[in-house]
Amino acid sequence: MHARVSTYQASDPEGLMEGFRSVSDSLEATDGFSHAYLMVDRDSGKAMSITIWDSEAALMTSVSQADELRKRATQPSATTIESVQHYEIPMIVGTPARA
């Protein structure tokens, strides 16, 4: 499994969350997508998204679509995309949580 970790600075965390809700169906329809997390510190406006992918190939194939979805999710709230990084997931402990 592989992950894409993106960090953000949001002046409107609620707007950012709504933006991510608006693109979630498109994300779920992407080949090789497993699941995702959005974490928000409402006080500081810092946020992070983690998307989990079945393989490195799926992660890399989704790069341009993920870029577009990230822009669509962040534009309405004027959120700044600070970084996007890719990681291998060599180990998982427990069961992924559902919100």
Predicted regions: what is each one?
Residues 1-48, 54-99:
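Short S/T/G/P-rich N-terminal loop/turn motif that feeds into the first structured element of a domain
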